[in-house]
Swiss-Prot record:
Subcellular location: Cellular thylakoid membrane
Assembly notes: F-type ATPases have 2 components, CF(1) - the catalytic core - and CF(0) - the membrane proton channel. CF(1) has five subunits: alpha(3), beta(3), gamma(1), delta(1), epsilon(1). CF(0) has four main subunits: a(1), b(1), b'(1) and c(9-12).
Family classification: Belongs to the ATPase alpha/beta chains family.
Pfam families referenced in this protein's UniProt entry, alphabetically: ATP-synt_ab, ATP-synt_ab_C, ATP-synt_ab_N
Gene assigned in the entry: atpA
Gene Ontology MF terms: ADP binding; ATP binding; proton-transporting ATP synthase activity, rotational mechanism
Described purpose of this protein according to its UniProt entry: Produces ATP from ADP in the presence of a proton gradient across the membrane. The alpha chain is a regulatory subunit.
InterPro entries (alphabetical): ATP_synth_asu-like_sf, ATP_synth_asu_C, ATP_synth_asu_C_sf, ATP_synth_F1_a_nt-bd_dom, ATP_synth_F1_asu, ATPase_a/bsu_AS, ATPase_F1/V1/A1_a/bsu_N, ATPase_F1/V1/A1_a/bsu_N_sf
NCBIfam families, sorted: atpA, PRK13343.1
Catalyzed reactions per annotation: ATP + H2O + 4 H(+)(in) = ADP + phosphate + 5 H(+)(out)
Coiled-coil regions listed in the entry: none
Its membrane topology: Peripheral membrane protein
Family matches, as HAMAP family: ATP_synth_alpha_bact
Protein name in UniProt: ATP synthase subunit alpha
Length: 503
């Protein structure tokens, strides 16, 4: 008979007690009271945080936006067709965050960073909260480096610096997106990572933009975030913050980034829709009271960081659509007051054939001139003045029949200066050649060339400089000034090219 040894049994029991681990999973759950129009009212979820992600039984994710006494208002980030009254909701304990890293470059994603380009999963190295505090005053440095758009009218008269926020505003179909895409194309080889955020646009329009970027090799340094018109309002509301988070990740690594929000009017409309469905009180134009904060907290994240933080930058180009040129509407005035200047595109100029249709009179850049290169400063001052005088004289000349010779000369010069600012889409011009064409225009070298031949002349002059006088481009690029050597080369090139030019 086997003898039972109590000490052995007690040691085995003691061992098992020591190894026993009781784990209790406590889930914060609630019940759906009502669902519809992309909003769910949930009872329970006692300890839910503002903007916390919640998960429904069918896998749909939502954000808890309204925390009320007896229920929680949740915005759905999906169709939510499987959600019904009485179904269970689970709080995740997480605030919305997105995967970021080098792997996202060249991809097309939705507002939650899910790939929509058919190229498989994104293997990101880090995550970043959608809503991050903007850098403080001490962490910033004043804007001091130029961000060249490749558009002569902007780089000369409304210069943009790295870390600036410059609004692009205008009616529909005035070329706002074209200006933004040209700016992305011009960043090739400039070591700038671009993020294009498409909000509430047709999927076909976004596909067109992606194709242009791919064809011109710009997708190698660009990320496209798309919340299409068919997507839920919650995704259209979140998309700009996703774009800002991606750019912020690179900015804090000491890199330069450019973010385009196309456009914030549609984001404000999506937010208005959500707010009204959540029964928040409407204000002016039925927008909620915090619509200013919606845009200010987004745009304040754009910054030029100080050297201690790596000197990275995030430049924001928000786009806002106006109705019949009314810049005094609610959203346009809000965004104008938040940004560091605006580029106003006019439908009248667009229809008159002046493209890009930039109205230089009411467009301003409040901090960009500090970032403009010296060569451009040398020629742009005269251009601004002569164009302003031309606009004034043109209005006056409509009523006067006989004009003196000086006035006629000034009008003729103004017409030629307008011609050099015209530029086809998707053809950004390097800054040294912009300087050359403005120099030729403001110093009278185009005065004897017919107005209709000016575009052909300046395009030919740029090619001639690139092929026959490459040392001019090198001199301006290296010194960033139009010094005596560069000016002599330029004068020589203009004279040589003009001698062989036929209109």
């Amino acid at each position: 008979m086997v003898s039972i040894r109590p000490d052995e049994i007690s040691s085995i029991i003691r061992q098992q007690i020591e190894q026993y681990e009781q784990s209790i999973n406590v889930d914060n759950v609630g019940t759906v009271l009502q669902v519809g129009d992309g909003i769910a009212r949930v009872y329970g979820l006692d300890k839910v945080m503002a903007s916390e992600l919640v998960e429904f039984e069918d896998g749909t994710v939502g954000i808890a936006l309204n925390l009320e006494e007896d229920n929680v208002g949740v915005v759905l980030m999906g169709a939510g067709l499987g959600i019904e009254e009485g179904s269970t909701v689970r709080a995740t304990g997480k605030i919305a965050s997105v995967p970021v890293g080098e792997a996202v470059i060249g991809r097309v994603v939705d507002a939650l960073m899910r790939p929509i380009d058919g190229k498989g999963e994104i293997h990101a190295t880090a995550t970043r909260l959608l809503e991050s505090p903007a850098p403080g005053i001490v962490q910033r440095k004043s804007v001091c480096e130029p961000l060249q758009t490749g558009i002569t009218a902007i780089d000369a008269m409304i210069p943009i610096g790295r870390g600036q926020r410059e609004l692009i505003i205008g009616d529909r179909q005035t070329g706002k997106t074209a200006v933004a895409i040209d700016t992305i194309l011009n960043q090739k080889g400039q070591d700038v990572i671009c993020v294009y955020v498409a909000i509430g646009q047709k999927a076909s329009s976004v596909a067109q933009v992606v194709n242009v970027l791919r064809e011109r090799g710009a997708l190698d340094y660009t990320i496209v975030v798309a919340a299409n018109a068919s997507d839920p309002a919650a995704l259209q509301y979140l998309a700009p913050y996703t774009g800002a988070s991606i750019a912020e990740y690179f900015m804090y690594q000491g890199k330069h980034t450019l973010v385009i929000y196309d456009d914030l009017s549609k984001q404000a409309q999506a937010y208005r829709q959500m707010s009204l469905l959540l029964r928040r009180p409407p204000g002016r134009e039925a927008y909620p009271g915090d619509v200013f904060y919606l845009h200010s907290r987004l745009l304040e994240r754009a910054a030029k960081l100080n050297d201690a933080l790596g000197g990275g930058s995030m430049t924001a180009l928000p786009i806002v659509e106006t109705q019949a040129g009314d810049v005094s509407a609610y959203i346009p005035t809000n965004v104008i007051s938040i940004t560091d200047g605006q580029i106003f595109l006019s439908s009248d100029l667009f229809n008159a054939g002046l493209r890009p249709a930039i109205n230089a009179g009411i467009s301003v850049s409040r901090v960009g001139s500090a970032a403009q290169i010296k060569a451009m400063k040398q020629v742009a001052g005269k251009l601004k003045l002569e164009l302003a005088q031309f606009d004034e004289l043109q209005a006056f000349a409509q009523f006067a029949s006989d004009l003196d010779k000086a006035t006629q000369n000034q009008l003729a010069r103004g017409q030629r200066l307008r011609e050099i600012l015209k530029q086809p889409q998707y053809s950004p011009i390097p800054v040294e050649y912009q300087v050359a064409t403005i120099y030729a225009g403001t110093n009278g070298y185009l005065d004897d060339i017919p107005v209709e031949a000016v575009a052909k002349f300046v395009a030919g002059l740029r090619d001639y400089l690139a092929t026959s006088k490459p040392q001019y481009g090198e001199a301006v690029r290296s010194s960033q000034k139009l010094d005596e050597t560069a000016e002599a080369l330029l004068k020589e090139a203009i004279a040589e090219y003009k001698a062989g030019f036929t209109a």
